[in-house]
Amino acid sequence: MNKTIRRVVVFAGVLLVVLLLNLTWVQVIHAPELRNHPRNFARTQLTQFGRQRGQITADGVVLASSHYDEATKKFHRVYGKNADMWSPITGYFSLYSRSGIEYAEDAILSGQDDKLFGDRVIDLFTGRDPRGGNVALTIKPDMQEAAWNALQTGVGAGPLVGGVVAIQPSTGAILALASSPSYDPTPLASFSNTAVNNYDEQLRAMRPSPLINRATAEPLPPGSTFKVVTTAALLRKGVNANTYVSNAPRTILPDTVTPLENYGGEYCGGSTFGMAFAYSCNVPFADLSRKLTVREFQHTAESFGIGETYDIGVNEMASTIGDIPDAAALAQSAIGQRNVALTPLQNAIIAATIANNGVRMKPYLVEAETAQDLSVLYEAKPKELNRAISEKVAKQLTKLMITAEQYAGGANTLTVPVASKTGTAEHGTDSKNSIPYTWYIAFVPGHDVAVAVMIEGGAGVNRGSVGATVAGPVGRAVLKAALGQPTPKSVTPSYPRSPNYQPTATATYSTTVTQNNQGNNQGNGGTGSGTARNGNGGTNTEGDDGE
């Protein structure tokens, strides 16, 4: 072979190697990015409609499944009974986008996850139609239904606008996650572009928006529920239930002439910190905040997870305490006002951490992933994040919260003691004439469940609404469902069980405490949003029940 031919052969060989390397790059390494590119999204979705997508279940209840449509020769996504009750969790799967668990677990549900590689190879050689895996959630349907029914019943006048989250303190498993108003994801799964677009436009135009997940993606001023965080910081500094405090109706913010008042500008509670906590008096908390440095206050908030997101599989926004430039801002923040803004998820984590003797567990929504043959691909394991507070402080807080439940002004219809804190947060530029955000966080000592409720409005809610009479009944309904007690307006669940249902031991809800007591909205034009609406910096009152 002469020199010229040899050069041509070498050059051709190099080109072949480059071609193979480029092919490997495009087909293997770069493939996921190309597949998920917005311009390829609709084409990828159409391909997925050609295979059977996996089920989403909760304790055996089928929330989402795929049915073969003879007319279109494609698999149609079908959502189960009360789909609007579940859509803040499941999200939707459409031609243009996905959200919620449908997005977060898409690789498993579509069968594209590496954990299902063996199944894909078998399908290739056997000629079996490719199928996706299944996702089992930690949600308990009876608790979810209790939360949803309570939100729809409200104060007797109609549906409320708000969110609910219940957590198992010992594991972090999310037992209920409800948001109202909500939407039916079924029309978004239509094969008709026109139908999907029309429904999407209707949802976007609705007010209050059903697309906001108020349980996880709308941080709002928590009012007096935040006093449990402030109290944790104060207890660390030596304050206790018998510490003397003023019951004066107002105080002056440090280094200012600005007054801060109790709810209604009234004398509040007795002369001890324990009674000030029970009656949710603002003045003692503002005065005692002088004992704390800004960093100590921030550290306590951070230890409870404020500022974090948890990647649970639905759209989330981080809670915040905002900037605290001086002692006056610290006093306002200490009562859950100014720029403090929490989600029900974060407030539920705070309650669960106290119930778990001060240990914060990572919240999770996915209990297990399985292949079509029910072989387990993934099983959730509880994960301890940190010790937020000492066991001693947790027990002190529990006692204070049990007393607060007794003085809150709402009726405890449970047959066991409840540890709780209510909140009624003013907000906006005209806070005195705005409907307050009402809150309730609670847990049942000796039982492995904690709950947080936020109500921002709805039928029958007005400027005089308070936490115990609006949010409190919703939270207690969820706790009653957790304990197996009858709940108002509830019905016996009649959901169809998955034929593949097999109970698992992982994150199984129990009403007995263990010894240690331990959204995502993606795609082109995706539906869904999250907002943060913090309290007005000049708001200096915060109200609670019985004040």
Where do the language-model regions lie?
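Beta-lactam-recognizing serine transpeptidase/beta-lactamase-like catalytic domain environment
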Residues: 174-224, 229-457, 467, 513, ...
